[in-house]
A protein has these predicted regions:
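Short, well-structured beta-strand segments within conserved domains
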Residues: 9-11, 38-48
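Surface-exposed beta-strand/loop patches in extracellular or lumenal glycoproteins
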Residues: 2, 7-17, 60
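Solvent-exposed beta-strand/loop surfaces of large extracellular or lumenal domains
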Residues: 18-37, 52-59
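Short amphipathic beta-strand/extended segments with alternating polar/hydrophobic composition
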Residues: 13, 27-29, 73-75
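C-terminal beta-rich recognition modules with glycine/proline-rich loops and embedded aromatic residues
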Residues: 43-193
Length: 193
């Protein structure tokens, strides 16, 4: 900043929610104030930092945020086309319905006090399902989630949460970079099955 006058002025920088700012004076949150010298050339440099964090959701579940981005565990799935006639309206491809079924494990819990590793990836499209721009690697514990009573393909609203195996290293990706996903997971203590 080049400043000619004799007056000092204050530059206010609002630090976005879910981030902090790092400069030569340390790390801060909220509002960042810079006081300029009376005149002359003035430079400053700072860096915005976001850290992965778990937020509590209803029903004792948690979601992973990184800055303003919500992350989810991607689930492999298969689509089955449903063509039918209802109330005289024919639903044929491409105007039919689809059911999506999981082809990979989805019953997991966050492991208390596990680290999160943010991985920046090369990408061509911001919400690419196969090559998302960011991934967060962490340990998840396989659990017995259970099904809604009377439904074979509807996950229980409140998981049982009982550990069913050893912790596994998994990568979560931005919510918008997934089709079939688990976004809210319970928390489980570190340990072995």
């Amino acid at each position: 900043v080049d400043h000619d006058g004799d007056e000092r002025w204050t530059l206010r920088v609002r630090i976005p929610a879910d981030t902090e700012i790092k400069d030569c004076e340390g790390t801060r949150e909220g509002m960042f104030l810079l006081f300029t010298p009376p005149a002359g050339h003035w430079e400053t440099e700072w860096e915005f930092l976001a850290r992965p964090r778990l937020i509590k959701r209803p029903r004792e579940l948690y979601a992973l945020l990184y800055g303003a981005l919500l992350f989810a565990l991607p689930i492999e799935g298969r689509k089955e086309k449903r063509e039918y006639i209802s109330d005289g309206v024919e639903r044929k491809f491409p105007y039919c319905d689809y059911e999506i079924f999981p082809d990979s494990a989805w019953e997991y819990a966050f492991v208390r006090e596990c680290d999160f590793e943010v991985i920046e990836c090369a990408y061509e499209a911001a919400f690419d399902r196969d090559r998302p721009p960011l991934k967060i690697k962490t340990k998840l514990a396989p659990i017995d989630w259970g099904w809604e009573e009377g439904h074979r393909w509807v996950a229980a609203v409140c998981p049982k949460g009982e550990r069913s195996g050893k912790d596994e290293e998994k990568s979560l990706q931005p919510y918008g970079s997934t089709t079939l996903r688990m976004t809210e997971l319970p928390m489980i203590e570190k340990g072995e099955k």
